[in-house]
Amino acid sequence: MPESSKLATVLAVVCLSGGSGKSTSVLNLATMLSEKGRTLAIDFDPQGNLTQWLGWTDLSEDATVAETILPDSDRLLVKEVIKSPVNEERLGRLLLAPADYSLSRAADAIIMEPGRERFLKRALKPILDDYDFIVIDSPPAKGILTYNAILAADFLVIPTECTNKGVVGAVSSVVLVRELEDLDFQVPKILGIIPTRDQWAGANQTRMSKAAITALKESLPGMHIFSSVRQSTTVQRTNHVGWSLQEAGESSLAKAYLEVVDALLKAKVHG
């Protein structure tokens, strides 16, 4: 938990399965949280989808979040790499620590360094009192970058597509957090699972989606399951212009993310 109510609350968005809607979730959650306070979105996925959606398509001449986790002699401060989204209409409330494929090289560079699992946590420490919320995107696989995203966070949410693969990814993500806890790392509280790409045929949910959500509940008893995010081309369109679903007037599609924001705010108060 945050050490002080004045420090940023850090939320990691993690799933060990591709196509889960992680970057979509980060875009929506960070944008919604920016209405509540100053928010920093950290793209910690070398694919850099979040970075591109927020308007930064070429970082060849720019420093990125990769430089903030390098060994001491080459390391930059997070505040040295922060950018405003190109399509910024949020009056500076939402900022971005961008990423590109150089983040993979940075991960390779630190693989033998002691304490490497917490380099992102170390990098964030000097800026925790500059923000109300920090939201971290992560790669869709086990590895040093995902460990860093998890261990830098106070809270964690797991988006996962409504497929068998998605169920496996969600369960594997929960197992990973428990494994890190067993190794005596301080791990974040898991707020719950967001079922994404929930497919419907007209007014009826497809059998596959229904079975996946049932499997999530059975595989992870006691884990909170948020409302699902329906499969929609609207999600893709809003992503590519850097808007949240709420900003686009799609409140029904945004329901799950509004629930996560509410859960995070309550957890921040009650711990």
Residues covered by each model-derived region:
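P-loop NTP-binding core
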Residues: M1-G271
